[in-house]
Structures are given as C-alpha cells and as structure tokens.
C-alpha cells in the first residue's frame, strides 16, 4: 500500500505585512491550517490587546491535506506572491502524524469519572464520561495547566446540572462541551477565531451534546448565564469586563484562567471594586480565579 502524506510548506516573512500576505496566499492555495514560528531566537512576550506582533523573521507554515501535489501548490503560491520566496517543503506521513499526536496526547482523568481522550483511546473505567478530542483546527485539549484547572473545576465543583454556561474564547470547545456533559442545560460559546467555532461545533457533535451548544459569532448574542468561563490572557480579561457584565445576573459566577501568578494583582485592580476574587487553584505558575458579586 502506498503511504499517504500531509504536506507542510514553510516560507519566511521579514515583516508583519509579509506574514499576512503569506498566510493569505497559503490559505488561498488550500492550506487547512497556517501556523507561525520564530525563524530566529527572538522571543515575544504577551502583546498589547488588539495586536499580533511577529518576530523580525517569521516562519509561516501551511499544512495541506493528504496527497496534495507540492508542485501544483508551489506554482499557485508563486502566482499569488508575484516573486520568488524560498519555500521549504516537508512530507509528513499520515501514520507518523497520527502516531505522534496520539503519543503526545494521552487520556487525562479529571475526577468524578470524567476523562478527556482521543477517539482511538480505550477508557476502561466503569461509568466513565469521556470527552473525545482529535487533532483539529483550534487550541484546547486539556493538557495545558490553565485548561486543566478549568476542566477540574467544571467537573468537580461547579454543580452544573440545569445551569447555563458561557464559554468565552472557546477554542476547541472543550470547556463548554465538558459543561454540557456534566449537566448544564445550555452552553453558549464564542471566539474571535471563526475556525474555533467550526471546531467547537464538530466536537460537540462528536460528543453528542450539540443540542445544548449555541455558537455565538457575535458575543452579545448570549444571554445572562449562571457561569461564565474565560480561559484567555490577562489583557483581554481586563479589557472585556464590560462585555462580560452583559451576561451576568446577581448570582452569576465567573471563572478566569490563562493567568500567571504574578498577574493576579493586575486582574484584581480591574475587578475588585465590584467582585470578590478567590484563587481556587494554581498549577505550574498558572492560576484559576473565581469571581462573584460583592
């Protein structure tokens, strides 16, 4: 049998405008995903809200579907770019891609018989609830400490039966799907990345909770909810306070993660006038905060 391959093509951008140009060209040529990586040793720390700064030299990599013809794609790129950008190509065998991902992503238990696992993994625990996730378009598999802490809270401490939840910055949809599986009656999800909403919908269907999930392309479409979960960065958490408050009632709870320990004070400065703020978990320098109205 002939081995099938994914195709990775990488181009180097010298400035932010080139990054956007190359990303657009790769997507127009059929890339199913585009990622950025440093082409040197330069580091970028947390950017200002509303900005996406790049390295001085940025590798822009497109991942193309199985059995893509590299020569045809490169020809399309050259036509679109109008100049000769060096292109590095790499063929990734389908089996290697799947095997590498499965080796990296092992089943994770979060207590209360709840697991996150790939479709290929077998969970033998009796009465287990298993949230199935596979390689996809958006971030969020439960391996990062901030996501893991959110999941642990939803599974063990949130008492979600019959409640409404807003998963703000949903990524793969993992948190909202977990809430639905733990008994929430309605879960609203939003994200600034349209691919995240696509991934959330597909994952909700896979986990048979799609009837409870409501995707909001516009954040304002969600109503007031019992629990708002936001696993995003410090600056958006601070900047979005007014937006979050549109979706709260007097007894609502907010759960924030995506924060480092050293950032808690700044978050408190943005919320402490009207909210009681509790640190309820900490892992590997990341924290989970619970906010309730004073």
Curated annotation (Swiss-Prot):
PANTHER family to which the protein is assigned, alphabetical: ELECTRON TRANSFER FLAVOPROTEIN BETA SUBUNIT LYSINE METHYLTRANSFERASE
GO cellular component term of the entry, any: cytoplasm
Asked if the record carries the keyword Methyltransferase, the reply is yes
Instruction: Provide an example Pfam family for this protein.
Output: PrmA
Query: Can you say what this protein is called?
Result: Ribosomal protein L11 methyltransferase
> In which organism is this protein found?
Dichelobacter nodosus (strain VCS1703A)
Q: Supply the SUPFAM superfamilies for this chain.
A: S-adenosyl-L-methionine-dependent methyltransferases
Family label: Belongs to the methyltransferase superfamily. PrmA family.
